[in-house]
Amino acid sequence: MDSDNDNDFCDNVDSGNVSSGDDGDDDFGMEVDLPSSADRQMDQDDYQYKVLTTDEIVQHQREIIDEANLLLKLPTPTTRILLNHFKWDKEKLLEKYFDDNTDEFFKCAHVINPFNATEAIKQKTSRSQCEECEICFSQLPPDSMAGLECGHRFCMPCWHEYLSTKIVAEGLGQTISCAAHGCDILVDDVTVANLVTDARVRVKYQQLITNSFVECNQLLRWCPSVDCTYAVKVPYAEPRRVHCKCGHVFCFACGENWHDPVKCRWLKKWIKKCDDDSETSNWIAANTKECPRCSVTIEKDGGCNHMVCKNQNCKNEFCWVCLGSWEPHGSSWYNCNRYDEDEAKTARDAQEKLRSSLARYLHYYNRYMNHMQSMKFENKLYASVKQKMEEMQQHNMSWIEVQFLKKAVDILCQCRQTLMYTYVFAYYLKKNNQSMIFEDNQKDLESATEMLSEYLERDITSENLADIKQKVQDKYRYCEKRCSVLLKHVHEGYDKEWWEYTE
């Protein structure tokens, strides 16, 4: 806009975590590995991440702009657009700025080079008695018009309507371009602040540019918990366990619940596979077969054994009973009378391979889901344990003495979460000597975890109080130790490249 006002738009509006329609707001999809065993020994306090409120996010955004401008010395709105273009990577922006052709640099970022001031436009507008709005074609005095450095000018009502539509209806923030047809110059935040008077639209705009800032910045991530408005800021980006102020614990790299020992890329594949397969896999296994030629799944909906594949590129005719070609069956439409089983055996072997693959998937899926379902009872279990703690205090035990129960539930939930993700890890793992050691560790931890769960569900009486306390303490310490052993072994395997994968 034709204005020297560089004040930040966000001074008087709230900010928040909402989805943005701007380009470049997709997840950065970090493809990095879990830290090495040596790195994991480092105390978690050494990974100095911060949990930021939306106001702190806005302040952090200002700080980055100010730091960049110490060298750029550009108008603040221009610097904001440039930083957004470079995904808020200040170093990359400065490198390109000082290395590239200046005009080309600003052109790629869709801003006018501020060093090439459009004096002609300013002189034209100052001499004119009236100007024509390029949208509604009204003749208005210059002070009723506004425009960007590209020279396209529109009346205030047209600007307001245009910007409101882009912000509210289309969900655009940092990537709103000039209203002139074919002009790709971006509208800066100061222009929006001066032209948009509707408080609802202003708040929405600030939410969008704040969200864009977080999603573009590889050192920031919104907490994925429902309705949480916090973001986590990290010193460097890698798969790390971060704990939001809302209580949610997640992996910074992918945003999923913390999933040690499985890596982000395998968890992503697993979640997609579960979404695609789990709801219908059991029914498919019981009621369908695959075409022996193209493997398309076919349901038998009548008594006839003569099957015709509906795949337009296949049209294979085969026998439902033996899966062999239908042609040698002659006119025997209802009963398979083939004597030579060679071809049928080949077809059945292929069918069995597919069934075996499905059975393997269901083995790991069912155990994964079992631990997930158990974890969903966490709140109920905490409530039950709280009641037990109160009962124990009635048996002359102090508040401090009964804290072992809460500690036990914490470790139980931690072990269940670890076990849940070990089945994802195991599903993609090829068999070797180290994988057998892993499975032994997994079995040992699972057995101990189930026993701890059983202890916590027992009724507590004055007669068994001492016995239950000793058993719970011994078992949760054992679970904690075995969980640590399992994770250490898996990460040692990552470091020494023991693990090979099926896909």
UniProtKB/Swiss-Prot annotation:
It is found in: Cytoplasm; Nucleus. Residues 1-11 have a biased composition (Acidic residues). Changing residue 309 to Y: In ari1-3; lethal phenotype and no loss of interaction with Ubc10. Its EC number is 2.3.2.31. Zn(2+) 5 binds at residues 291, 294, 309, 314. Can form homodimers. Interacts (via RING-type 1 zinc finger) with Ubc10. Interacts with the LINC complex member koi. Interacts with park. Interacts with ari-2. Specifically interacts with isoform ECR-A of EcR. Gene3D superfamilies: 1.20.120.1750, Zinc/RING finger domain, C3HC4 (zinc finger). This is E3 ubiquitin-protein ligase ariadne-1. It comes from the Eukaryota. The keyword Transport does not apply.
